[in-house]
Amino acid sequence: MNNHFKCIGIVGHPRHPTALTTHEMLYRWLCDQGYEVIVEQQIAHELQLKNVPTGTLAEIGQQADLAVVVGGDGNMLGAARTLARYDINVIGINRGNLGFLTDLDPDNALQQLSDVLEGRYISEKRFLLEAQVCQQDRQKRISTAINEVVLHPGKVAHMIEFEVYIDETFAFSQRSDGLIISTPTGSTAYSLSAGGPILTPSLDAITLVPMFPHTLSARPLVINSSSTIRLRFSHRRSDLEISCDSQIALPIQEGEDVLIRRCDYHLNLIHPKDYSYFNTLSTKLGWSKKLF
């Protein structure tokens, strides 16, 4: 065992039960290597592990030096929103479909993880967005997002009329099916599908991408990540929502605004030493290949 990481958390809820074999293999291997291991409570229950230290995501964030998320990007997003509040590094083993945020190949995960545990890794900070639904005389409803915050109708698709203010200055109005507000991390997710630009992870920028705008002139907008975005609504309907990473939905009531800003904390995401963002674009998303 080395001094880079002493306590390691195992998290992630796989879509297919067969993926639990990766959790169990990882747990046994880490114990054999002499690490202190904390297993997320639900995973320990599903694996029927006895006399094993377990904890919630928050407890793992408080106690562990490294969290290994086993699953796909959805698992990573769900875990990362909580773990980002704590001083913990996060890495993923891909047991999902795309695995854009989960770097480690399940067939070679232990060797790759061994290198990481020996200190051979790349570390980067990914910022989150904080979304607030608020009105002066009402309590705020707050959530966070690693990828994106999306304004959309709640049940039936229809046009939404809204205004966008950036740092309390009017920027534009729009009639569309919604709006995607994305981090650089999320620029290769839903935002990309809607025609948004790809932002490299180190950029301090936020993109605003219209969803099916009823105009010929709407274009994605890139702004500084220090800006605050306010969404205002004229003719309110009762079914508008904002969703965070397509996992958490906050309803918008009449008279309420939506505020979106950069979070005060960030995700400590680590990768194998040979990680390349542009290689990931190529292998995961079919980015253009080299010609020579």
Curated annotation (Swiss-Prot):
Keywords: ATP-binding, Cytoplasm, Kinase, NAD, NADP, Nucleotide-binding, Transferase. It comes from the Bacteria. The active site is at D73 (proton acceptor). InterPro entries: ATP-NAD_kinase_N, ATP-NAD_kinase_PpnK-typ_C, NAD/diacylglycerol_kinase_sf, NADK. Transmembrane segments: none annotated. It is found in: Cytoplasm. This is NAD kinase. Disulfide bonds: none annotated. Equilibrium mixture of dimer and tetramer. It is converted entirely to tetramer in the presence of the inhibitor NADPH. GO terms for molecular function: ATP binding; metal ion binding; NAD binding; NAD+ kinase activity. Allosterically inhibited by NADPH and NADH. NADPH is the primary inhibitor during aerobic growth and NADH during anaerobic growth. It comes from Salmonella typhimurium (strain LT2 / SGSC1412 / ATCC 700720). Belongs to the NAD kinase family.
